[in-house]
């Protein structure tokens, strides 16, 4: 006979994306809600891009997976490892944390140096340690991990993020990588710190230990910056002079947390004037998200959404289908809810 059948049709498909009310200058972008795990906006999300220092998120992942004691494991810096940087073609891409030959730091301290300042020395020191004396061996671990966690268009060529045409990713893969990193103990605390001072300074190299500190490169998190954004945290910045400025940041307001992935915003506008479009884009997307989205019931559990034919039945030859529970999604207030089809 006829009856009501609960259906889970609505929760499974969250593939609604929306159009922001601002121009996004970055080559590729994703706006993602951490609470509902919805992608709310994407631009060229599957187009390959060079990630720059965003690579260091994967460097951190491999270290965290291979180091059981971040505070008890120390490494003494050897400039043999990073002498090659001195002859690098694009010196503007190099980032240093003032780590000198003979400095002994904990793995956690090297991770802070790398995540906050994009330190190339810290990246190479960590990669050498956890690649068992081989940077190439470490890069293999980076690529193996990317494949294991579901990246489909990412290849790593070095642990620093410096320019290499083989080094490619997508905004969608960077979302996968960042979410995986955030699931690991210790990552978020390090990547969202606003500053860090190492405690084991070598006095010969750093006579004024208190002056040796690292500040978060994401100026959206710094209260004295004109780009300060209330609720923003970390996670990673990355510039390459040949490709542009990139940033991944998260922000929380009113218990809603968004993650923004932005790859390769141009350095200049059409008139050749220096711009910080990656920060403009992040601000635009977050403002739009916090202003425009609300939890909305797309479908109530009492709503009948379809009639399904039943073969060989007594009496009525169909059942009425309705959702098991109310279907609630994050929805853009300016988009008419009646535009949603239930089938």
Where are these regions (language model features)?
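Conserved beta-strand and immediately adjacent loop positions that scaffold enzyme active sites
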Residues: 1, 28-30, 247-248, 259
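Short, basic/aromatic-rich helical patch in the C-terminal catalytic core of site-specific tyrosine
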Residues: 1, 59, 268
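Positively charged, low-complexity/disordered segments
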Residues: 2-6
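Domain-terminus/edge residues, biased toward the C-terminal soluble/receptor-binding domains
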Residues: 151-152, 165-343
């Amino acid at each position: 006979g006829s009856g009501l059948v609960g259906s889970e049709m609505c929760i499974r498909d969250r593939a609604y994306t929306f159009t922001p009310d601002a121009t996004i200058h970055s080559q590729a972008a994703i706006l993602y809600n951490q609470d509902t795990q919805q992608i709310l906006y994407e631009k060229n999300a599957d187009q390959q891009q060079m990630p720059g220092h965003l690579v260091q998120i994967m460097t951190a992942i491999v270290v965290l997976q291979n180091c059981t004691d971040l505070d008890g494991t120390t490494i003494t810096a050897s400039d043999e490892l990073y002498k090659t940087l001195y002859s690098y073609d694009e010196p503007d891409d190099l980032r240093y944390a003032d780590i000198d030959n003979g400095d002994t730091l904990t793995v956690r301290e090297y991770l802070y140096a790398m995540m906050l300042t994009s330190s190339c020395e810290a990246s190479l020191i960590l990669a050498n340690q956890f690649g068992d004396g081989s940077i190439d061996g470490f890069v293999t671990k980076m690529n193996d991990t990317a494949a294991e966690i579901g990246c489909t268009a990412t290849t790593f060529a070095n642990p620093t993020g410096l320019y290499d045409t083989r080094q490619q990713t997508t905004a969608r893969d960077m979302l996968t990588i960042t979410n995986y990193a955030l699931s690991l103990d210790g990552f978020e605390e390090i990547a969202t710190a606003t500053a860090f001072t190492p405690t084991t300074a070598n006095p010969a190299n750093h006579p004024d230990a208190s002056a040796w500190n690292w500040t978060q490169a994401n100026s959206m998190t710094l209260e004295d910056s004109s780009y300060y954004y209330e609720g923003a945290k970390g996670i990673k910045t990355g510039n390459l002079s040949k490709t542009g400025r990139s940033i991944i940041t998260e922000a929380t307001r009113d218990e809603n947390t968004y993650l923004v992935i932005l790859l390769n915003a141009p350095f200049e506008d059409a008139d050749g004037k220096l711009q910080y479009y990656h920060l403009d884009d992040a601000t635009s997307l977050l403002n739009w998200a916090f202003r425009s989205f609300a939890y909305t019931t797309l479908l109530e559990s009492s709503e009948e959404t379809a009639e399904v034919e039943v073969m060989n039945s007594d009496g009525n030859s169909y059942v009425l289908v309705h959702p098991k529970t109310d279907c609630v999604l994050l929805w853009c207030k300016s988009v008419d809810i009646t535009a949603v089809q239930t089938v």
